[in-house]
Amino acid sequence: MAVQISKKRKFVADGIFKAELNEFLTRELAEDGYSGVEVRVTPTRTEIIILATRTQNVLGEKGRRIRELTAVVQKRFGFPEGSVELYAEKVATRGLCAIAQAESLRYKLLGGLAVRRACYGVLRFIMESGAKGCEVVVSGKLRGQRAKSMKFVDGLMIHSGDPVNYYVDTAVRHVLLRQGVLGIKVKIMLPWDPTGKIGPKKPLPDHVSIVEPKDEILPTTPISEQKGGKPEPPAMPQPVPTA
């Protein structure tokens, strides 16, 4: 028997489920370029789509890893047997995904690459992928004992207004190095895309599109136009004289 819950509780429960699932997959698939999760609920089953840059690693050998993840999710969230399905989907444009770039920068810093060089490499890759702008902030004990932050910016970046919600993709990650924990924040401003594949369909409010004038067909031969004047009033019938 299904338990009836209010709409408010339903929204809260869905939010908690997605947040917990996202945290679990972030820990589990960090090395495989995990970039987010989508949950689609149908009347018969729940479909969980994992977005990643290396989908083959997520699936595992002969689909073993995805089956293990399905079993863990099913047990943790109390889904009935066979009612949850996990899929792996490749991220179309890795350079426009903030989570993927934050993870990439994290592994570069763990590998011992200099902060400035690693950040400029990520910045260049993002801009080459077609982004309108990007911002990378690394904070912590970068050099010496005193904590400080370094900001790297390129292109255009909006910070306020409603378009921030759908134009700016943000990700925050932490990396533990020998000198302490560094914080990584990546912000990517997506380009406007009428098809909606690599960016929002809705243009920015200040976007101005210039419409090309239509080609006027010029007359090849002289044409005379007769403009009609005022129509003459109909003649009144003349009275017939009587003898």
Curated annotation (Swiss-Prot):
Annotated effect of mutating residue 70 to D/E/R: Abolishes phosphorylation by PKB
Phosphothreonine sites (modified residues): 42, 70, 220-221, 242
Post-translational modification N-acetylalanine, affected residues: 2
Q: Mind telling me what this protein is named?
A: Small ribosomal subunit protein uS3
Which regions are flagged for Pro residues bias? 231-243
N6-succinyllysine found at: 132
For the cross-link Glycyl lysine isopeptide (Lys-Gly) (interchain with G-Cter in SUMO2), the position is: 214, 230
**Ranges for the KH type-2 domain?**
21-92
Source organism of the structure: Homo sapiens (Human)
Gene Ontology cellular component? cytoplasm; cytosol; cytosolic ribosome; cytosolic small ribosomal subunit; endoplasmic reticulum; extracellular exosome; focal adhesion; membrane
Q: Which residues lie in coiled coils? A: none
Organism placement in taxonomy: Eukaryota, Metazoa, Chordata, Craniata, Vertebrata
